[in-house]
UniProtKB/Swiss-Prot annotation:
Localization per Swiss-Prot or TrEMBL: Cytoplasm
UniProt binding sites for GTP: G48, A49, G50, N51, N52, G135, T136, G137, E166, R170, D213
Entries under CDD domains matching the protein: FtsZ_type1 (cd02201)
Family recorded in the similarity comment: Belongs to the FtsZ family.
Biological process, per Gene Ontology: FtsZ-dependent cytokinesis; protein polymerization
Compositional bias (Basic and acidic residues): 7-17
Primary site of residence: cytoplasm
Organism ancestry: Archaea, Methanobacteriati, Methanobacteriota, Methanomada group, Methanobacteria
Organism, as annotated: Methanothermobacter thermautotrophicus (strain ATCC 29096 / DSM 1053 / JCM 10044 / NBRC 100330 / Delta H) (Methanobacterium thermoautotrophicum)
PANTHER family, sorted: CELL DIVISION PROTEIN FTSZ-RELATED, MITOCHONDRIAL DIVISION PROTEIN FSZA
Official protein name in the record: Cell division protein FtsZ
HAMAP family xrefs: FtsZ (MF_00909)
Length: 381
């Protein structure tokens, strides 16, 4: 181990290059190459929830991405914070919003297709964030995703499903919108809002919406900065594309820990997250973002990856990155995006057949639960 200790001491003594070295011709040339080759990433937040996400990203910062707020409601758009803003459907809605009707939101996006194309020009990767169930986000997100994908960008939609408290109508709107979104984007990361209440059941609804916005923002920031921010283990755009291109549905799990065996605790928390409440054994692949302060070790990161790999098919493609964030102060944070999953929120191309299959599986489970309960009662009496 002596050679390792010697190497550490030498690295600590090593000085940064002088300013004259940094300003050399070769460094300027390298900097120019890096700037020109950097993936162009846009985060489009459409509708109320989408605008909240880009506003939150503007507050916490997302390195290497531009934010674009899109809305049919001029007032909501005015109060949003983003690098760029786009009011869609001026003739259809007149800046007054879509009235909670997805068909109106879709019509507004179609009216403004040329404007949307201009905003997305030259993008390598586009995130489209929205809350499903209302008018603008549900209606416009599939149109925006389709235009981004047609322009050649890797297109990742990140969408929330509504709380049950929002009513059956919004739920039905959300399910129809999700089906359209799946057809339009490369990957759709679904965040079921009801699952947030399993973590904090007594959370007031307004606070629950804020938590949903935070999770949307963290998901987008985590994936983006795996590409744009240098790390302990860095990824490039091609790495992320290999997982997310044409992957269909995806779910996300998050966990963090600071005491004991923090690496294992954080990954188990992420895998057991209510947001990732489904069988992932047949998933196509996983994207793992590991963050920690300067005491994060490569061994800890590798243990996290090994645990995730054990849960997936041996042929699944796993890409991971590790980043140092000093503000975490002894905390390890693990974010897992599992792509190519069968989601309970959409039934895919075979619709009713798959729905019947899932319902039959649930009936079998209920039957087993009832028989176990009967045995328990018989044993007691």
């Amino acid at each position: 181990m002596k050679f390792i200790n010697d190497a550490i001491k030498e690295s600590e003594k090593r000085e940064k290059p002088s300013s004259s070295s940094m300003n050399s011709e070769i460094d300027r040339e390298l900097r120019e190459i890096i700037e020109n080759s950097r993936a162009k990433i846009y985060v489009v937040g459409t509708g109320g929830a989408g605008n909240n996400t880009v506003t939150r990203l503007s507050e916490i910062g997302v390195e290497g991405a531009e934010t674009i707020a899109v809305n049919t409601d001029a007032q909501d758009l005015f109060y949003s914070v983003a690098n760029r803003k786009l009011l869609i459907g001026k003739n259809v809605c007149g800046g007054l919003g879509a009235g909670g009707v997805p068909e109106v939101g879709e019509e507004c996006a179609e009216e403004s297709e040329d404007d949307i194309r201009r905003e997305l020009e030259g993008a390598d990767m586009v995130f489209v964030t929205c809350g499903l169930g209302g008018g603008t986000g549900t209606g416009s997100a599939p149109v925006i995703s389709k235009l981004a994908k047609k322009a050649g960008a890797l297109t990742i939609a990140v969408a929330t499903m509504p709380f049950s408290a929002e009513g059956l109508k919004r739920r039905e709107n959300a399910e129809r919108g999700l089906e359209k979104l799946q057809s339009a984007a490369d990957t759709v990361i679904v965040i079921p809002n009801d699952k947030l209440l399993e973590v904090a059941p007594n959370l007031p609804l307004n606070k629950a919406f804020m938590v949903a916005d935070e999770i949307l923002g963290r998901a987008v920031k985590g994936i983006t900065e795996l590409i744009t921010k240098p790390g302990l283990v860095s990824l490039d755009f091609a790495d992320v594309r290999s997982i997310m291109k044409g992957s269909g549905m995806a779910m996300i799990g998050m966990g963090e820990a600071e005491s004991g065996d923090r690496a294992l605790e954080s990954v188990y928390e992420a895998l057991n997250s209510p947001l990732l409440d489904l069988d992932i054994s047949n998933a196509r692949g996983a994207l793992i973002n590991i963050s920690g302060s300067s005491d994060l070790t490569l061994q800890e990161a590798e243990r996290i990856v090994e645990v995730v790999a054990e849960e997936l098919d041996p042929d699944a493609n796993i890409i991971w990155g590790a980043q140092i964030q000093d503000e975490l102060q002894n905390v390890i944070r693990t974010t897992i995006v599992v792509a190519g999953v069968r989601s309970p929120y959409i039934y895919g191309a075979h619709g009713s057949a798959e729905k019947e299959f899932l319902e039959e599986k649930q009936r079998e489970k209920d039957s087993v639960d009832e028989s176990v309960l009967e045995e328990f009662i018989d044993g007691v009496f």
